[in-house]
């Protein structure tokens, strides 16, 4: 296909136009008074949401060059979402501010490579400062505050996540389900999560989120490699008759068998997903046995004289729900408490008997996975559209609280970044010179952008508020919900340090890449063939004949 090649300032300006479009559509959602965005869907009802990364994923422009700018800034949001699970809108606003200021300097003749060095050095300095200022989370009240802010100031959601963390522990699994009522409810049930995702992305049932969700599936557990599909055929035929989904957990599934499963899945013959068993050697077998106890099934192993080709439905485990993404598998089981309790006691005895610290550690991990259970939040709402929005907010809140437990919290509402602007200014003035200093100043100017946008979305003058906040003590900031200046930590307006740090790092990275762009190669737009578009002679174009 023919390509279009654009150089220099023209290339950077085309990227900037795409970045402007994406940043503006995402930035309207920032802060407690941020607005919603409606996404038109080809099938089904439109989606009304407040989640930065979901909006970013939806935007595709007609102009290929501008679309490249959209894709770049979308990456800043996606990477922040992958690392911290929240803060995607902040990352987008920061990246946009850095790109705008940087392009002005490049147009004025500054060296883009040296500017990028300055941006990178300033970012490294700020990351250290954010980590220094982070306060560890000490109680469930702070967890609730974090969840509340991430869920768009929904206190009920924040409190529910704090309760869930109390019940399953800070490392515990919190899963989301669509509820059947108007109320959002919390339930703790047996279950486990392990660090293995689907073997093939073709198993995903939700292609937007790249997740496989199986409701009330059968679970086939085996410690052998599945090489031939013939081994699976008898059990697959039995399951196909029931119409239920199937999860296969095996040491590995080789190409031929995997291809057959994928083809059956895509044709709709059988809703199946396959994951590799976690762990290695004896530990793998022990973990598979734990899963068998949890799901009320049997581990099909030749050590016990069981073969795959002879497997029957009563050997398979069952669960309420299984959610699989590219990295993890979460099994939500129920009604098997006594067996799980007995298995936990057995693991505790093994821990008492072993002298090896390593073995103790691994047994402790197994015990935590089995005994911890899964907190299931059943999302309730009046309509499907509201439920989808609520689910995304809850997901942000869960991710934010986990990030806060990991790296601590900092004052929220854009306050931390705004206060750090003066620190980076004095550090850069003494440590950098020339165009590197200009690069650091670009970062400094961008640091107030999230606070300004939060204030503007609340109907206030962003520039005035940003200057006012910078002159106040470190923890003081602007509460956009009430329009007052408050101590952010006391008011419970906090952000996880990890979210703030990830957003800044990803924004700087993308800004540096855009500034150092000198040429873009993109597809030429396809010419639409006018002649072939018309209807046959004398026939109206609106009817099927």
Swiss-Prot record:
ATP binds at residues 29-32, 86-90, 413, 479-481, 495. It catalyses: ATP + H2O + a folded polypeptide = ADP + phosphate + an unfolded polypeptide. The keyword Secreted does not apply. InterPro entries: Chaperonin_Cpn60_CS (IPR018370), Cpn60/GroEL (IPR001844), Cpn60/GroEL/TCP-1 (IPR002423), GroEL-like_apical_dom_sf (IPR027409), GROEL-like_equatorial_sf (IPR027413), TCP-1-like_intermed_sf (IPR027410). CDD domains: GroEL (cd03344). GO terms for biological process: protein refolding. Pfam families: Cpn60_TCP1. Coiled coil: none annotated. GO terms for molecular function: ATP binding; ATP-dependent protein folding chaperone; isomerase activity; unfolded protein binding. It comes from the Bacteria. PROSITE patterns: CHAPERONINS_CPN60. It is found in: Cytoplasm. Its EC number is 5.6.1.7. Gene3D superfamilies: GroEL, GroEL-like equatorial domain, TCP-1-like chaperonin intermediate domain. One of its GO terms (cellular component) is cytoplasm. Keywords: ATP-binding, Chaperone, Cytoplasm, Isomerase, Nucleotide-binding. PANTHER family: 60 KDA HEAT SHOCK PROTEIN, MITOCHONDRIAL. Belongs to the chaperonin (HSP60) family. Forms a cylinder of 14 subunits composed of two heptameric rings stacked back-to-back. Interacts with the co-chaperonin GroES. Together with its co-chaperonin GroES, plays an essential role in assisting protein folding. The GroEL-GroES system forms a nano-cage that allows encapsulation of the non-native substrate proteins and provides a physical environment optimized to promote and accelerate protein folding. This is Chaperonin GroEL 2.
């Amino acid at each position: 296909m023919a390509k279009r090649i654009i150089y220099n300032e023209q290339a950077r300006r085309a990227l900037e136009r795409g970045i402007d479009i994406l940043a503006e559509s995402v930035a309207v959602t920032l802060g407690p008074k941020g607005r919603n965005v409606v996404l038109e869907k080809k099938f089904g009802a439109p989606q009304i949401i407040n989640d930065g990364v979901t909006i970013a994923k939806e935007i595709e422009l007609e102009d290929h060059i501008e679309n490249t700018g959209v894709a770049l800034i979308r990456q800043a949001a996606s990477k922040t979402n992958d690392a911290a699970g929240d803060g995607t809108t902040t990352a987008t606003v920061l990246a946009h501010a850095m790109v705008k200021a940087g392009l002005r300097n490049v147009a004025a003749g500054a060296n883009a490579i040296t500017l990028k060095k300055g941006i990178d050095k300033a970012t490294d300095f700020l990351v250290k400062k954010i980590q220094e200022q982070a306060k560890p989370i000490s109680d469930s009240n702070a967890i609730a505050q974090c969840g509340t802010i991430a869920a768009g100031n929904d206190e009920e959601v924040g409190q529910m996540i704090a309760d869930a963390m109390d019940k399953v522990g800070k490392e515990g699994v919190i899963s989301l389900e669509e509820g059947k009522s108007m109320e959002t409810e919390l339930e703790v049930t047996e279950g486990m999560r392990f660090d293995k995702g689907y073997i093939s992305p073709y198993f995903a049932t939700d292609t937007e989120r790249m997740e496989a969700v199986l409701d009330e599936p059968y679970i086939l557990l085996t410690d052998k490699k599945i090489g031939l599909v013939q081994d699976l055929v008898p059990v697959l035929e039995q399951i196909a008759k029931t119409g239920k989904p199937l999860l296969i957990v095996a040491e590995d599934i080789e190409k031929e068998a995997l291809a057959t499963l994928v083809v059956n899945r895509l044709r709709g013959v059988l809703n199946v997903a396959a994951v590799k068993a976690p762990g290695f050697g004896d530990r793998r077998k022990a973990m598979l046995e734990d899963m068998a106890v949890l799901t009320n099934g049997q581990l099909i192993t030749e050590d016990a004289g069981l073969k795959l080709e002879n497997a029957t439905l009563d050997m398979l485990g069952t669960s309420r729900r299984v959610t699989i993404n590219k990295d993890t598998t979460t099994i939500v089981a129920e009604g098997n408490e006594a067996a799980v309790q007995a298995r936990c006691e057995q693991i505790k005895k093994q821990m008492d008997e072993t002298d090896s610290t390593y073995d103790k550690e691994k047994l402790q991990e197994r015990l935590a996975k089995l005994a911890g259970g899964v907190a299931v939040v059943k999302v309730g709402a009046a309509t499907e559209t509201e439920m989808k929005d609520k689910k995304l907010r809850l997901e942000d809140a869960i991710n934010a609280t986990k990030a806060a437990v990991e790296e601590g919290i900092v004052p929220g509402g854009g306050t931390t970044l705004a206060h750090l602007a003066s620190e980076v200014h004095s550090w850069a003035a003494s440590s950098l010179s020339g165009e590197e200093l200009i690069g650091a100043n670009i970062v400094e100017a961008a640091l107030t952008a999230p606070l300004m946008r939060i204030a503007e979305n609340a109907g206030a003058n962003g520039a005035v508020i940003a200057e006012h906040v910078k002159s106040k003590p470190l923890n003081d900031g602007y509460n956009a919900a009430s329009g007052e200046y408050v101590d952010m930590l006391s008011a419970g307006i906090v952000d996880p340090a990890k979210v703030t740090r990830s957003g800044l790092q990803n924004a700087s990275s993308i800004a540096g890449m855009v500034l150092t762009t000198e040429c873009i190669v993109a597809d030429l737009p396809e010419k639409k063939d006018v002649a072939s578009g018309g209807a046959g002679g004398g026939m109206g174009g609106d009817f099927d004949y």
